[in-house]
């Protein structure tokens, strides 16, 4: 499937339910031992943790949206990464969307983030902590040129390279999605230490943030992991294909309805949503 078709499918998936979804009616985590259920784009979570809003190492954006819930492994990853960043004097980590209290489908903006194992992190590290007003209405820093072929040199900082590398080297991380131009710059800057680049995957948009995805926890038996990324650093022909013009004759895919929920997620909805 060509890149344009994939982009359209992703857009349709993320906007298939712009009306409020039943998952938004669940305002607190579902009690129980932490269990990520289903796939990243069709699942839910029992026993989610709440990311502490107050931290000296990170700040949480758009708290009014209440998307700061996730599997305990995700909360620990955020705390671990932000502590590393702080200890290196790199700045404050800005945390975007995680998931809703019980996971599940958003009403727009995300096709994934459903099992409590995804988090968006801004690709900027302010030295001065943001105000409450800035956090509620954050201003993203677009690192990619208008033509989409490279990063803006005046905005690309060594600290951003280090932030992505630190995240990719974490034992629980399986994928990090960034814009192809950002992946390209990482390839240029990486030097001989390149194993971590395998986890960094080019994807549409993602011009101002990285989308970090964790592996399924070992005790979440109903969690569906993705296959591992292809071997290698991903800096060759695969990456360059993202910069090629779309092939002629590309057609818009038909709008698809969301797939059925995993049975455990449907049972959760039936029990907790009136």
Swiss-Prot record:
It is an enzyme of class 3 (hydrolase). Murein endopeptidase that cleaves the D-alanyl-meso-2,6-diamino-pimelyl amide bond that connects peptidoglycan strands. Likely plays a role in the removal of murein from the sacculus. Its cofactor is Zn(2+). The keyword Transferase does not apply. Its EC number is 3.4.24.-. Zn(2+) 1 binds at residues 110, 113, 120, 211. This is Penicillin-insensitive murein endopeptidase. Zn(2+) 2 binds at residues 147, 150. It is found in: Periplasm. Keywords: Disulfide bond, Hydrolase, Metal-binding, Metalloprotease, Periplasm, Protease, Signal, Zinc. Dimer. One of its GO terms (cellular component) is outer membrane-bounded periplasmic space. It comes from Escherichia coli O139:H28 (strain E24377A / ETEC). The keyword Lipoprotein does not apply. The gene is mepA. Belongs to the peptidase M74 family.
């Amino acid at each position: 499937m060509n890149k344009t078709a994939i982009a359209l499918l992703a857009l349709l998936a993320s906007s298939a339910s712009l009306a409020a979804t039943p998952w938004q009616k669940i305002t607190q985590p579902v009690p129980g031992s932490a269990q990520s259920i289903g796939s990243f784009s069709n699942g839910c979570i029992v026993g989610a943790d709440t990311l502490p809003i107050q931290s000296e190492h990170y700040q949480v954006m758009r708290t009014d949206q209440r998307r700061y819930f996730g599997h305990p492994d995700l909360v620990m990853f955020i705390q671990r990464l932000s502590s590393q960043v702080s200890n290196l004097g790199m700045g404050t980590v800005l945390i975007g969307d995680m998931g809703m209290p019980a996971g599940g489908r958003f009403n727009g903006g995300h096709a994934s983030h459903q099992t409590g194992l995804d988090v968006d992190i801004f690709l900027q590290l302010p030295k001065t902590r943001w105000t409450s007003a800035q956090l509620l209405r954050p201003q993203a820093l677009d690192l990619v040129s208008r033509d989409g072929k490279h990063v803006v040199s005046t905005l690309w900082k060594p600290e951003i390279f280090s932030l992505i590398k630190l995240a990719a080297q974490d034992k629980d991380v399986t994928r990090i999605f960034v814009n192809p131009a950002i992946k390209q710059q990482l390839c240029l800057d990486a030097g001989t230490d390149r194993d971590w680049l395998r986890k960094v995957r080019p994807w549409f948009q993602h011009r101002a943030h990285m989308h970090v995805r964790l592996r399924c926890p070992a005790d979440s038996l109903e969690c569906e992991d993705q296959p591992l990324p292809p071997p290698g650093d991903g800096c060759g022909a695969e990456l360059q294909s993202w910069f090629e013009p779309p092939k002629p004759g590309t057609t818009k895919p038909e709008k698809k309805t969301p797939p059925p929920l995993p049975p455990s997620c449907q049972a959760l909805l039936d029990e907790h949503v009136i």
